[in-house]
């Protein structure tokens, strides 16, 4: 854990008028620094190391969907969490990605300061890169604490973002099948 990061959290406590020496806050700077490093550990990860060769030969050329992948990220504007789920689909062309690796790719990009729109795009292009799929579709649904806890304070709003590549973009029937499979009927 970065000692300087803990020192910055100490200064934040002072800056908001708290006493970092009171009993409940004595270890808070260290704990907050450790938590932030964990929440941003995606910067230290490499896509090909995350996938770790988990690509398997397959004759399947039908859609593969992994839906409801929980995700937690921090918005780059306020450093507040957004929490939701990702739905990832692709059309394989001879190779399929290990199931857990789809979730790990989501986590790798979610564990960075980001906006949801970019997160959606990064996941889609990463899956495309490692699988060489005929198409990739990603939909993310998330609640943003920066909108719930401050600003307009809207508790029930959900942001939905999507990125469609290849056949998911070019073929309405492929896109429609994906959206039906994840319960997003259009």
Curated annotation (Swiss-Prot):
The keyword Nucleotide-binding applies. It catalyses: GTP + H2O = 7,8-dihydroneopterin 3'-triphosphate + formate + H(+). One of its GO terms (cellular component) is cytoplasm. Its EC number is 3.5.4.16. InterPro entries: GTP-CH-I_C/QueF, GTP-CH-I_N, GTP_CycHdrlase_I, GTP_CycHdrlase_I_CS, GTP_CycHdrlase_I_dom. Transmembrane segments: none annotated. Keywords: GTP-binding, Hydrolase, Nucleotide-binding, One-carbon metabolism. It is an enzyme of class 3 (hydrolase). It comes from the Bacteria. NCBIfam families: folE, PRK09347.1-2, PRK09347.1-3. Homomer. Belongs to the GTP cyclohydrolase I family. This is GTP cyclohydrolase 1 2. It comes from Pseudomonas putida (strain ATCC 47054 / DSM 6125 / CFBP 8728 / NCIMB 11950 / KT2440).
